[in-house]
Amino acid sequence: EVLSDGETVPEKSGVKKFLITGGCGFFGANLSARLLERGHPVVLFDNMSRKGAEPNLAWLRGLGKPEVRTGDIRDAAAVADLVRETRPDAVFHLAGQVAMTTSVKSPVDDFMINAAGTVNLLEALRQHRPEASLVYSSTNKVYGPLEGVKLVEKERRYTSPSHPHGVREDQPLDFRTPYGCSKGAADQYVLEYARTYGLRTAVFRHSTIYGCHQHATFDQGWVGWFCRQALEQKAKPGAPAFTISGDGKQVRD
């Protein structure tokens, strides 16, 4: 059963306690919902700054009793208190600055959230909960523009004869844009804390995630944004046209 706020989880009970940073965002909310449905105690850590966080939290509270901690990943003391007080068995680190365009406008904020914020969490785990597992949500941007991969333009899409099923995760890293650099730095710190300090960490390099509860915008979550724009065009003849960058043949995994 789902444990109420404040109850402790027996270390060997088999019921795992999960901490999700960015827990009220698109990815975090969907993951939290699945864990709550399976009876796990879940702690959500979010600064509630992004559009959609409040309705996502309301949805989650209709599914169970998540423990909610409002705070900022940039606040090292708050993150340390979070880990020390909640003692999670596993952490999904999903909090972050998610738009490349925002990183270009505000590179310092982007770095402090994505890179420094991740180190704050790693240090908190190292000091207070080294046995916990950490899964980090990275990005395909760490691979850069893939300049060495030849692309062939077809009628409806681009293809890569040398990589028909996409590039492998051992593709050399090539950080580009402030966003790629901040996420790439965090990506490598997560792996290095496993090598240097023995933390249990893993990195997922996601690309073009979309789905329910996303609240997509033009510069982040573009599949959802395109779908919404297309529906609005259909529902409102004469609505302003929307812009597709490039030729529309780009392919993501």
Feature map (PLM): residue ranges:
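C-terminal substrate-binding subdomain of Rossmann-fold SDR/epimerase-dehydratase oxidoreductases
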Residues: 2-5, 22, 37, 71, ...
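N-terminal Rossmann-like NAD(P)+-binding domain of SDR-like oxidoreductases, especially those catalyzing
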Residues: 2-209, 214
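Intrinsic disorder/low-complexity segments enriched in polar/charged and small flexible residues
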Residues: 61, 224-227
